[in-house]
């Protein structure tokens, strides 16, 4: 799937997976320092782009213990972040050797020109899966080393087609990117692929997560288990709603995405939340359920409606 993929949900960054996530955006998030040494090998620098969908801002991570270190993600291109990075590197007598981009979204990639401005040699050290012109590729299982840190790349699509996570071997920690957040849950391009990725991340058996947004995840296995359970629960809610309408109105009864949202989430919804978040996500849930053989759709007079193929078992 290309960057046009399922799209508006990720292109605008005005997206979220479902109402659990929406509630988190409005909750009081714990403050995070602009710069913090979160482990002996990792310094976190906030992207200075806090917002409804970026939480406290994009986390960028300087990794290693020597004078040459690597950085994971580059935030959104705000001058305040560039100034923080420049001062942090200078104060610690650090020079960057590699720049790793977890995925293509602008709140992770737009700081690249600032890093190259600070050190033109970095133009040869920008790494990304499905790289843009002039960038170097990252492959699943590829290993990178700097003094004090060994990173192993893990291809982790679902939130985006090119998403990479990184295992920090010395700490049994995982840089989770946008696949697992410090608070709430992530938007996805492909729900089925995303759930497969979560199980792949589980198999890495990392204890701690360093997310691209939000606080450190101290119990990463528990967080991933909860993510899988939440998404499975959403699938079940959709199936139950479609099964109920079939039982009430007959075998051919079906619902549009908007009607299904009314049944599952109620009608008192903010219109932006409905259009930018719930409708794209509900459509993705239905796509996965169709791939799994549980639902199907028909199109009549240009209107797509969905119906259950099997009775839901409790």
Swiss-Prot record:
Zn(2+) 1 binds at residues 103, 105. It is an enzyme of class 3 (hydrolase). Its EC number is 3.1.2.-. Keywords: Hydrolase, Metal-binding, Zinc. Binds 2 Zn(2+) ions per subunit. The keyword Metal-binding applies. This is Atrochrysone carboxyl ACP thioesterase AgnL7. It comes from Paecilomyces divaricatus (Penicillium divaricatum).
